[in-house]
Amino acid sequence: MVKKLLIIIILFSTLHAKDAFERHCVKCHAKLPASLHRMFFNYLLIYSSEKNTKEAIIYYLKAPDRDISMMSDLFLDTIGVKKATKLSDHQLKRAVDIYWQKYNVIDKIK
């Protein structure tokens, strides 16, 4: 009985768990003046391809630096440079993949 209850609880929590992007990115970014949508398009304007954009985001999140930030000087002076992510490589890749899927309009046009 306890075993069945435990399995049901695990299945229920798994089904209702937010994805990596929602859990690790959206909560903090919701408080910022620049939206995730806007940041996505800034990356896309500079890096163009999916591969280059994802690599640039992951690189920045692992080692944030003002010199490679996509944000304006005003934003960085006000908000500052974020701290390096504590996500594992797998979690980070998954979150960036979801970010790409949510905001990429190119695939939605086809």
What does each model-identified segment do?
Residues 21, 53-57, 91-95:
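Stable alpha-helical elements in mature extracytoplasmic
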Residues 97-110:
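Short, low-complexity, Pro/Ser/Thr/Gly-rich segments in the mature regions of secreted, periplasmic
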Residues 26, 30-60:
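Gly/Gly-Pro-rich "capping" loops immediately C-terminal to redox-active cysteine motifs
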Residues 4-13:
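Sec-dependent N-terminal signal peptides
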Residues 22-23, 87:
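Short beta-strand and adjacent turn/loop elements
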Residues 15-19:
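Boundary at the C-terminal end of the N-terminal hydrophobic targeting segment
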Residues 36-45, 62-95, 107:
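Axial heme c-ligation environment in periplasmic c-type cytochrome domains
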